[in-house]
Amino acid sequence: MNSLSLPHRYPFLFIDGVTDSEPGKHAAAYKLISENDWFITDTQTEMPFSLVIEALAQTAAFTGITDENSLGLLSSVKKAEKLGEAVPGDRLDLTFEVTRNRRGFVFGHAKASVGEQPVAEAEIGIYIEK
């Protein structure tokens, strides 16, 4: 993963690796959910939905990054839907497909899944700062 592409560091970096990225088209990444993650507690046994959406936004940023000086910033989340859960031991797969690219804004459809089980979907907008 190109760590220069995201300003996030532990504990707010929610992707462990980028598996595919084509600027202007799509990106794919993953997060390995562990019992050691700070958000897993005795009462919180799954990755919170808001953090799944953040992981999707971090994945989406890679569709607009063209060089090490580019920075992707979350600008919008619409139609966010929780469809399942990601618990310790799961690999959360994250994908983002670009639907529009306009004046520095990248919009698209994001999906999170564990295996074949969907976890979340959302329409996400990212602003790319150069």
Curated annotation (Swiss-Prot):
Residues forming coiled coils = none
Q: Quote the InterPro entries the UniProt record gives.
A: FabA_FabZ, HotDog_dom_sf
From which domain of life does this come?
Bacteria
Write out the similarity annotation.
Belongs to the thioester dehydratase family. FabZ subfamily.
Protein name per Swiss-Prot or TrEMBL: Uncharacterized protein YcsD
By which gene is this protein encoded?
ycsD
